[in-house]
């Protein structure tokens, strides 16, 4: 079966056979003219292309010249939509080319305290800009040349924990229930968000860890940070108490803004009772500043700008003096108590802290646990350290049961009666 191309070729051959010599010469001249016209068009297009390349090269050199550092730093104040068709035309008025432009215009404020209206934005796509963005502008034309990273207080940047903590839940003894509650409230919403969505449950925003000193609150927070791939910000309550008015609130605001940018994120606020005490009437400006800092924290936890991808872990020894507004549901939803360890937990803690030590097999940790009534986790660690130091003093190669007993006596002698204040 013949193809369509073969049929066309046969048809053209038949036409050529039917044409006279003069007709063939005339057709060939027409083809030569068409070829010459196409070559001239191609030559003209190549010349135009070379001209455009030259112009592009010149413009790129001008842009490179204008983009030379240093930039003038500015903030986007407002982004406006320009539509010149809506404006009434005035007869006899000069034509302003900028006013005829369609699209987005920008109002920005520079670091020299000037407010500038830009009908032409510059080298940045205006769709990628929003009010409050930090931009670099040309110091003469004020055209936006580049977007700059958000500005944060240097103290807030120092709060970010760069090195991932090495602690694990296996390093914490006797707190299985507390570990489970913390995992449910903080870790699961970050690692298995779909399980909460399937049940229609909104996970807690924050967790309060409270209990006597040395019971493992900070250790638990470090283990939680190690188990998730989230950014970890560590704040201390006294850090947020600043001398100047509004400085502490700005630190809280910047910390949550940095957390939002690096979400998912865990913010750990240690010793929250430094800023979270109950509000009272006071004429002292320092007390009012502490209360303002706490109000900013309340707003960030449960305000219009709150973010579910940011979790807060707060720790304190004095939960009884915290403000009720901080403790209510929707802010620090889950309260986890860290009591003094039980006898079984004390034995487990002693085993954890002595597992890297060369311990004599005859050491009875259950008996040691019965001898350490009312000891907290930190004191049990001190017992292991003291036992190791006593063995070192004897030039021994392993730590014996007697060393642990002597360590308990030394730590018990250093115990302060004032610790009962936290119980």
Curated annotation (Swiss-Prot):
Q: Which family does it belong to?
A: Belongs to the AAA ATPase family.
| Xref: PROSITE patterns | AAA
Gene Ontology terms, MF aspect: ATP binding; ATP hydrolysis activity; proteasome-activating activity
The species this protein belongs to is: Solanum lycopersicum
User: A single GO BP annotation from the record?
Assistant: proteasome-mediated ubiquitin-dependent protein catabolic process
Asked whether the UniProt record includes ATP-binding among its keywords, one would answer yes
Q: List the disulfide bonds.
A: none
Q: Which GO terms describe its cellular component?
A: cytoplasm; nucleus; proteasome regulatory particle, base subcomplex
Q: What is the lineage of its organism?
A: Eukaryota, Viridiplantae, Streptophyta, Embryophyta, Tracheophyta
State a single Pfam family of this protein: AAA_lid_3
Keywords in UniProt for this one? Answer: ATP-binding, Cytoplasm, Nucleotide-binding, Nucleus, Proteasome
- Work out whether the entry's keyword set contains Secreted: no
Please tell me where ATP binds in this chain: 211-218
Stored InterPro entries: 26S_Proteasome_ATPase, AAA+_ATPase, AAA_lid_3, ATPase_AAA_core, ATPase_AAA_CS, NA-bd_OB-fold, P-loop_NTPase, Prot_ATP_ID_OB_2nd
Q: What is this protein for, i.e. what is its function?
A: The 26S proteasome is involved in the ATP-dependent degradation of ubiquitinated proteins. The regulatory (or ATPase) complex confers ATP dependency and substrate specificity to the 26S complex.
**Compartments, as annotated in UniProt:** Cytoplasm; Nucleus
Highest rank taxon of the organism: Eukaryota
Record-given protein name: 26S proteasome regulatory subunit 6A homolog
């Amino acid at each position: 079966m013949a193809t369509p191309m073969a049929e066309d070729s046969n048809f053209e051959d038949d036409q050529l056979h039917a044409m006279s010599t003069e007709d063939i010469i005339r057709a060939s001249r027409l083809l030569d003219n068409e070829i010459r016209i196409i070559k001239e068009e191609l030559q003209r297009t190549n010349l135009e292309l070379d001209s455009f390349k030259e112009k592009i090269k010149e413009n790129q050199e001008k842009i490179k010249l204008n983009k030379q550092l240093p930039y003038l730093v500015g903030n986007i104040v407002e982004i406006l939509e320009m539509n010149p068709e809506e404006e009434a035309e005035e007869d006899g008025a000069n034509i302003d080319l900028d006013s005829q432009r369609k699209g987005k215009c920008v109002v920005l404020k520079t670091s020299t305290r000037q407010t500038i209206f830009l009908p032409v934005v510059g080298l940045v796509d205006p769709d990628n800009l929003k009010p409050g963005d930090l931009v670099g502008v040309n110091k003469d034309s004020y055209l936006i040349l580049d977007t700059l990273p958000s500005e944060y207080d240097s103290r807030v940047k120092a709060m970010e924990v760069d090195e991932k903590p090495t602690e694990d839940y296996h390093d914490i003894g006797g707190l299985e229930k507390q570990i489970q509650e913390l995992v449910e409230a903080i870790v699961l919403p970050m690692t298995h968000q779909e399980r909460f969505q399937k049940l229609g449950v909104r996970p807690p925003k924050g967790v309060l860890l409270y209990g006597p000193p040395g019971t493992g609150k900070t250790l638990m927070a470090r283990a939680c940070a190690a188990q998730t791939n989230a950014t970890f910000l560590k704040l201390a309550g006294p850090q947020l108490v600043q001398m100047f008015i509004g400085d502490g609130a700005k630190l809280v605001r910047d910390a949550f803004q940095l957390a939002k940018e690096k979400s998912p994120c865990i913010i750990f606020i240690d010793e929250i009772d430094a800023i979270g005490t109950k509000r009272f009437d006071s004429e002292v400006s320092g007390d009012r500043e502490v209360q303002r800092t706490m109000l900013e924290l309340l707003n960030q936890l449960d305000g219009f700008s709150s973010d579910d991808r940011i979790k807060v872990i707060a720790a304190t020894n004095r939960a009884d003096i915290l403000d009720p507004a901080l403790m209510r549901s929707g802010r620090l939803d889950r309260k986890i108590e860290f009591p003094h360890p039980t006898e079984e937990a004390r034995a487990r803690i002693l085993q954890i802290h002595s597992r890297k030590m060369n311990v004599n097999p005859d050491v009875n940790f259950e008996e040691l646990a019965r001898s350490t009534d009312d000891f907290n986790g930190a004191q049990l660690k001190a017992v292991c350290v003291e036992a190791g130091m006593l063995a070192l003093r004897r030039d021994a190669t392993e730590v014996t049961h007697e060393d642990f007993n002597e360590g308990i006596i030394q730590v018990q002698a250093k115990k302060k009666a004032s610790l009962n204040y936290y119980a």
